[in-house]
Structure formats: structure tokens, C-alpha cells
Design a protein with these regions (language model features):
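Short beta-strand segments enriched in small/hydrophobic residues
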Residues: 1, 8-10, 35, 40, ...
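Short, solvent-exposed amphipathic alpha-helices that sit
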Residues: 1-4, 83-90, 118-138, 154, ...
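Glycine-centered short loops/turns at secondary-structure junctions
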Residues: 2-4, 32, 57
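Short beta-strand elements in bilobed, periplasmic/extracellular small-molecule ligand-binding domains
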Residues: 2-14, 107-110, 128, 132-152
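Hydrophobic alpha-helical segments within soluble ligand-binding/sensing domains
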Residues: 21, 76-105, 122, 153-156, ...
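Hydrophobic alpha-helical
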Residues: 25-55, 126-127, 143-208
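Flexible loop/hinge segments that line or gate small-molecule binding clefts
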Residues: 44-82, 86, 98-107, 203-212, ...
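Hinge/cleft segment of the Venus flytrap/periplasmic-binding protein
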Residues: 105-115, 119, 130-131, 202, ...
């Protein structure tokens, strides 16, 4: 509204529907889009689509995640390596606060929805790097990192399986909303108040866990509204012929726990 521009919104029902997102990109080109704002579902597959769009002199602004090429004009997203490191730091603090001893065996399970999403891969990388340099020697990451394909039910069954197969699990890192919700559902269903959760994003299920004093949880809240808002402003400028030398813009994150929820209105 602020820019007085016509915006046509299209999306896929499941983040694994990569071909569907490619089809939407092709439709946008065919229908004469002046610019495209894209949250890529796959960092590899969408690279070719972005290249085809830019070959037609149509600017592309990415939000939420980047692609594995330079074929875009700007990208507004979380610094996901930094966010992963923050998540690992928070995990260690919460594990200590929950009474876990650094000399006792302990494991942390990890889930993500896609191992071809640059954003999620970077979150895991940041988490593992911080963990390797700061966790006690007896505390380990479960090597079986689960990929749930954006399916909440699979995320829940994967979390349950990890608990069943790894008796020393005392923590979970959910790298995105789907993974976090699946883990939350498992912890509630199995009443695992002894397991710490560090998640991403803030679904109703996650908020319910954070508000329950019997459970130990925190979530990394991305600023999606800023990604979309700043991305649209940038796209409008590019359509008008303005250029920017900077391509990546970190929109930041907020660590949300029960205290933060009480003190702030988080939508």
C-alpha cells in the first residue's frame, strides 16, 4: 500500500514442493512481472530459475534463505550461522540450568526439514561449530540428524524415535518451525520434562510449551515481517533502476522464552 504497487502473492502448500515453486517463477515471468520477491524452498534448484528471471532483466530479491549462486539482486534473511551459534549457546546454558552435570553422558538430537536449504544447513553448521568448542567432552550430538521433509507428523515420529534409540538425550535442536512443533508434540505426549528444547519460530504449540513452567524451552524468533517489508522496498527500488552494492542484509533474531512472552506482545 505504501508503495502503491500491485502485489501478486503465490506460494506452495509444502516447503518440499520445489517443482511447484519453480512453476510459480515461470508463471511470474510469463505474466510479465516487473520484479520477484522469493523465499526459496531449495537453495540449489531455485538457482536456475533465478538466473532465467534475471536474464530477462527482471530483478530478484530473496527473503528467508539464499540460493547457491549469485543470480539475485538482494537478500534479506537471518544470519543463520550466527543464529545457530546462539542456539547452541542457549542450549548449553539451559542444560546446565536443568541440573545436568558436565561429567555425565548427555546427547542432543537435531532435526531439520531440508538438507538442501542453505538457511537450515547454516543453522546446523553454526550450532555444531559452537558446540564443538564449548560443550563438555561427555556431551555429544546424536549423529543421526533427522530430516523430516516439512512434515510435522514425521518430525514428531522422528523425535520419538530419537528418544527411544538414544537414552542419554537431554536436549533437542529444532532448526525450523516444522521440526520444533514436531519435537514439542513429542515432549508433551511423552511428558519429557527432563528434555531441553531450543527451536526456531513461534507456532502456537511452541508458545504453549514456553508458557508451561514444567518444560524447558526457548525459541529463536526470526523477523519475517522485516524480511518481507524491507525486501519489498528493495525490490521497488530495483524496479525503478536503483542499484545497491550490498547484497546480504541480516534482519536479526530474538531469543524468546517464557519471560519474554510475558513482557512482550509476540505475534
Amino acid at each position: 500500500k505504501k508503495l502503491d504497487e500491485a502485489v501478486y502473492l503465490g506460494g506452495i502448500d509444502n516447503e518440499t514442493d520445489i517443482s511447484g515453486q519453480i512453476d510459480l517463477m515461470n508463471q511470474a515471468m510469463e505474466q510479465g512481472a516487473d520484479g520477484i520477491l522469493l523465499a526459496p524452498a531449495d537453495s540449489n534448484s531455485l538457482a536456475d530459475s533465478c538466473q532465467k528471471v534475471r536474464e530477462k532483466d527482471i530483478p530478484v530479491v530473496l527473503i528467508d534463505s539464499s540460493i547457491n549462486s549469485s543470480e539475485f539482486d538482494a537478500c534479506y534473511m537471518t544470519d543463520n550461522i550466527d543464529a545457530g551459534e546462539m542456539a547452541a549457546k542457549e542450549m548449553l546454558e539451559m542444560l546446565y540450568d536443568a541440573g545436568n552435570s558436565p561429567t555425565d553422558p548427555l546427547e542432543v538430537g537435531i532435526q531439520l526439514s531440508s538438507d538442501t536449504s542453505q538457511a537450515m544447513v547454516n543453522r546446523v553448521s553454526g550450532f555444531l561449530n559452537f558446540w564443538a568448542g564449548n560443550a563438555p567432552e561427555q556431551w555429544e550430538i546424536v549423529q543421526d540428524i533427522r530430516v523430516n521433509g516439512g512434515d510435522t507428523k514425521k518430525a514428531q515420529s522422528d523425535a520419538s524415535a530419537l528418544l527411544r534409540e538414544n537414552a542419554d538425550i537431554k536436549g533437542f535442536f529444532g532448526c525450523n518451525n516444522t521440526s520444533t512443533v514436531g519435537i514439542v508434540n513429542t515432549l508433551f505426549e511423552e511428558e519429557r520434562t527432563d528434555v531441553v528444547l531450543v527451536g526456531f519460530d513461534l507456532a502456537d504449540e511452541t508458545k504453549q510449551m514456553l508458557q508451561n513452567p514444567e518444560y524447558h524451552g526457548v525459541t529463536v524468533l526470526q523477523k519475517q515481517d522485516q524480511m518481507g517489508y524491507l525486501g519489498m522496498l528493495s525490490l521497488n527500488s530495483l524496479i525503478k533502476g536503483e542499484k545497491s552494492e550490498q547484497k546480504y542484509f541480516d534482519t536479526g533474531v530474538i531469543m524468546v522464552d517464557s519471560d519474554y512472552l510475558m513482557e512482550n506482545a509476540v505475534s
